[in-house]
Amino acid sequence: PKVAAEKVEDLPTNEEKQLRPKEVKFDTWDDLLKWEPGKRVDDDLNRASVPLASRFQGKQINEQANPDAKIQALSNMNSKAKDHASVGGEEFKAYAFDYWQYLDSMVFWEGLVPSADVIDAAHRNGVPIYGTLFYNWSSSIKDQERFAETLKEDSEGSKTFPIARKLVDLAKYYGFDGYFINQETTGNLVEPLGPKLRDFLLYTKEYAKSVNYPIKYSWYDAMTYEYGRYHENALGEYNYNFMQPENGENPVDTFFANF
């Protein structure tokens, strides 16, 4: 007789009694602005402990391959850390990425702050890892206001941004290398904000250098500089401003054309 296979549940039991650390999440920008290093009870366990290893390029096997080509992966490395422990657990299912040698950078697709196990795995293999600044594919007023709130200045026209500083402070404290910007929100509130976003990006770089922790931005091709959302699928007239250097500094460092 046929016997049904036992279903293995991939859920923690007695979750309310778990003392293992959770990944670092922020529900609002206000929550982010209130964050301070070391104030969370599990902060030490959520910090990376492995510095970014140096890498070297081996002998080129295929003469037709372009040595300047770069590969960046966007991956759900720890998709259940919000409910499970950010340091792993006894669950049956796990995503153990093992192709680090092919990557130039990894994006932690789940949120702003990669969990420590993922940062350490990337760094052991010499791969920079980025958190994700995610803005919905949307034109709702709520989502437009959320994007605009990111760009709130210390005072009007100051070109200094409190959220930019917090992003750098987060990366420095938890030990990751920058952010992937997935900005797909569009609408009347968003369309004029391209120049202000460029100022935000440049200020981030300036502040990061001032605290001796330079970070990088990777840019997903969705928001144009002046006209809202449009996938140009290349670096061109609608988006080049986000890559255009100023005083030797690029607003963003890598360009992710499309999937």
At which residue positions do the language-model features occur?
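Boundary/entry segment of secreted carbohydrate-active catalytic domains
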Residues: 6-94, 220-225
